[in-house]
Amino acid sequence: TIPLVSFIKLCFKTREKIKEHQVCVEPADGIFKVLLSFGRAGNGQIMLDVAHQMFARGKNKLDLTALHLTVGSDVNPLHTDNFEEVSFGPILYGAKKLGMHIHTRYEVSNNAGQDICDIVNNEGFDFLLVGSGISMSDSPDDIAATRYRTSFYNRYFKRFKAPESWFYPGALLKDKTKMFIARSNCDVGVFINRNFVKATNTLVVISSEEDLFLLDYTRTLLKATHGSVGIVAKMSTTTPGHDQILKELWDFVSSIPQTQLLPDKDLTPGLFNSYNFMLIGYNTWNDVSEHRKEALQKMPSTLILNKNRRSSSDN
């Protein structure tokens, strides 16, 4: 009974901690607040590298909080302190290597997605960065886990018409991304890890006017990486604002030497082979993930970005 009582107290204290923070905070001038939410400890350090390259050279000072949420039923309350120490070890090591000061935050939750959105919305964050989990990952362990989950679904659940989002990685990622974007009052990035180290060769996909915000993020990224960028203009001549989009793209590549507008109009495995990072807007991702599934098996590490039209956060 003692572990049970401890667990109840832990959940209560955690809920109270979240409530304490839930006083709406206005974003501070000159500060770009990023909430980086990670699951596995090793992923935290990789996502920190992404955040540092994406935001550290922005016009506003980067203020990053690393959040690790554990589902309540998975935690032994008597080992919480040790669990927290192990979870943040790699990301704190990464921060030290980068010369970054970061905040760490550990919570036990029974509704991780909602708690993450509550923290973002009530504490004045400008950006939410989350990982895709094993979805679309190309690590051997994650591929094996995905195959097992898919075969398990096909064998036991398909005949009962259970939702594919329970088991299929593409559907899981789509649902996860949609939830964070729908509930967060800030820009959101969902990171897909494909052995990410540094964004030295970045592919940027533009298919509509609403994707042009990616150019601002690209400009900041290049200040940190000093890499190169290739831009794919996926729109057609019938795309609304086609001429204006092209003008802005040409202005962009004309002003930044290490960028180029590619002749490619489609995303292919051959194109992906030349890049180690991709920036793509949320709506464009939804279209590409539906119609170019095979090609995406060869995609590089990718950050799916959504610009929140309700906020004016700007780094």
Which residues fall in each region the model found?
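Intrinsically disordered or low-complexity boundary/linker segments at protein termini
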Residues: 3-44, 132-315
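Extended, intrinsically disordered cytoplasmic tails
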Residues: 22-103, 107, 111-127
